[in-house]
């Protein structure tokens, strides 16, 4: 079942935790790709010095952060790598959840071609280990770039998230510091990164 607006229109920390175990769906090149979300990070606009919208900042780059809950926010890091976020809370609040890691479930051959331009069976153990265990890695595997920025996952067939009862499992959630935000003063110590314990597609344990 596809996640609706009510799922995203809640506290960002709650959304970030409850996205774990859900399935990210991407339709591209006539193929359906699916991955279980195993790692997320929460960012809460006005109060979070690690957020692009800290202090209510609004620019052309960050405007999507203020969009309807369930909207896709894609930004670029290091001038070349993309990161996928899902907007949470009410419109104009600027809450968002960064998807940091997925466990491939369906369409792995297509993901491999998008990620490495090779068939999956040709990948080295190192390449398989680093398939989708990081925000930019999963964007490459799913063919996500700035062209997907602003997509509404509530109605789009290109990208959405579903709750698939057939893959439900019990798991423990680890709460940890977010990664790569040492500039964010006290916010760098917030335990706003969440991941499924012992899952091999988590970027950093």
UniProtKB/Swiss-Prot annotation:
It holds the Pfam family Pur_DNA_glyco. NCBIfam families: 3mg (TIGR00567), PRK00802.1-1 (NF002001). It comes from the Bacteria. InterPro entries: Formyl_transferase-like_C_sf, MPG, MPG_sf. Its EC number is 3.2.2.-. Belongs to the DNA glycosylase MPG family. The keyword Hydrolase applies. Keywords: DNA damage, DNA repair, Hydrolase. Coiled coil: none annotated. Gene3D superfamilies: Methylpurine-DNA glycosylase (MPG) (3.10.300.10). It comes from Clostridium perfringens (strain SM101 / Type A). GO terms for biological process: base-excision repair. This is Putative 3-methyladenine DNA glycosylase. SUPFAM superfamilies: FMT C-terminal domain-like.
């Amino acid at each position: 079942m596809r996640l609706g607006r009510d799922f995203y229109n809640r506290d960002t920390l709650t959304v970030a935790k409850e996205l774990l175990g859900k399935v990210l769906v991407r339709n591209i090149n006539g193929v359906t790709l699916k991955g279980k979300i195993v790692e997320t990070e929460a960012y809460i606009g006005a109060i979070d010095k690690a957020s692009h919208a800290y202090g209510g900042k609004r620019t052309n780059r960050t405007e999507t952060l203020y969009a309807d809950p369930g909207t896709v926010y894609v930004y670029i890091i290091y001038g070349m790598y993309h990161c996928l976020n899902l907007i949470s809370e009410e419109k104009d609040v600027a809450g968002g959840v960064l998807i940091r890691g997925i466990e491939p479930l369906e369409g792995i051959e297509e993901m491999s071609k998008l990620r490495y331009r090779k068939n999956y069976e040709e990948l080295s153990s190192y390449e398989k280990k680093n398939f989708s265990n990081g925000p930019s890695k999963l964007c490459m595997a799913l063919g996500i770039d700035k062209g997907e920025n602003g997509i509404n996952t509530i109605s789009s067939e290109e990208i959405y998230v579903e709750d698939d009862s057939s893959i439900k499992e019990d798991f423990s959630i680890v709460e940890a510091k977010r990664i790569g935000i040492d500039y964010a003063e006290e916010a760098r110590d917030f335990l706003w990164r969440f991941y499924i314990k012992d899952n091999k597609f988590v970027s950093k344990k």
